[in-house]
């Protein structure tokens, strides 16, 4: 039996649709658990997906580039599933640019932000926040923010502009390396079926 970690929220419906197209059915479904004949799905916070795999509770999971880089876990990443692409960006108040000297940066991703600052040679004070990061420059808590954006609309609404793109975020299929060894046949079979469904869906999409 395969155990999967599924991220709650915007990716949940997409992932579950792919699983059902792959041929899995679920006899029991709740907000935290989906159970079928050959599969169990744990519905978890996106940031918790790698934790479930690292600790051996789940064999396969789905999570974004942002989570993988923030958590810095060693998981197998065979391919990603097509979703709306978003970006991790550095942003600040419109027209002010990047300040000289020490920079106060608010973010939900302190590890990603720290490494980014180091690559730029900046002296930064990182302010970890759990939500509403775009409020930090308005309130005077930070000079800049590092956050995820898809369309840039929320940034514009708060009079912020993108100053740098740090990386593109995709949704990765991730595999526990131990499971890949001990359940290789099951894992490989699942990945092949999933990839086939994804490729079929892509081929069915109308071309512009």
UniProtKB/Swiss-Prot annotation:
GO terms for molecular function: ATP binding; ATP phosphoribosyltransferase activity. It is found in: Cytoplasm. Pfam families: HisG (PF01634). Keywords: Amino-acid biosynthesis, ATP-binding, Cytoplasm, Glycosyltransferase, Histidine biosynthesis, Nucleotide-binding, Transferase. GO terms for cellular component: cytoplasm. Disulfide bonds: none annotated. It catalyses: 1-(5-phospho-beta-D-ribosyl)-ATP + diphosphate = 5-phospho-alpha-D-ribose 1-diphosphate + ATP. It comes from the Bacteria. Its EC number is 2.4.2.17. Pathway: Amino-acid biosynthesis; L-histidine biosynthesis; L-histidine from 5-phospho-alpha-D-ribose 1-diphosphate: step 1/9. GO terms for biological process: L-histidine biosynthetic process. Heteromultimer composed of HisG and HisZ subunits. Lacks the C-terminal regulatory region which is replaced by HisZ. Catalyzes the condensation of ATP and 5-phosphoribose 1-diphosphate to form N'-(5'-phosphoribosyl)-ATP (PR-ATP). Has a crucial role in the pathway because the rate of histidine biosynthesis seems to be controlled primarily by regulation of HisG enzymatic activity. Belongs to the ATP phosphoribosyltransferase family. Short subfamily. This is ATP phosphoribosyltransferase. It comes from Thermotoga petrophila (strain ATCC BAA-488 / DSM 13995 / JCM 10881 / RKU-1).
């Amino acid at each position: 039996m395969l155990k999967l970690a599924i991220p709650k929220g915007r990716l949940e419906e997409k992932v579950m649709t792919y699983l059902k197209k792959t041929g899995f059915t679920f006899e029991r479904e709740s907000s935290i658990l989906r159970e079928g004949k050959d599969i169990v799905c744990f519905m978890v916070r996106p940031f918790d997906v790698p934790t479930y795999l690292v600790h051996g509770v789940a064999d396969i999971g789905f999570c974004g580039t942002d989570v993988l880089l923030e958590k810095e876990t060693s998981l197998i990443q065979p391919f990603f599933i097509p979703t709306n692409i978003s970006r991790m960006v550095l942003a600040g108040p419109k027209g002010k640019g990047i300040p000289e000297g020490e920079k106060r940066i608010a973010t939900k991703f302190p590890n990603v932000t720290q490494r980014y600052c180091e690559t730029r040679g900046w002296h930064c004070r990182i302010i970890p926040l759990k939500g509403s990061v775009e409020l930090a420059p308005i309130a005077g808590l930070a000079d800049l923010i590092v956050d995820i954006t898809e369309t840039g609309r929320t940034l514009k609404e708060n009079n912020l502009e993108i100053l740098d793109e740090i990386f593109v975020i995709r949704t990765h299929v991730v595999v526990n390396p131990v499971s890949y060894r001990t359940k290789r046949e099951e894992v490989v079979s699942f990945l092949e079926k999933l990839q086939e469904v994804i490729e079929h869906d892509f081929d069915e999409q109308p071309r512009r």
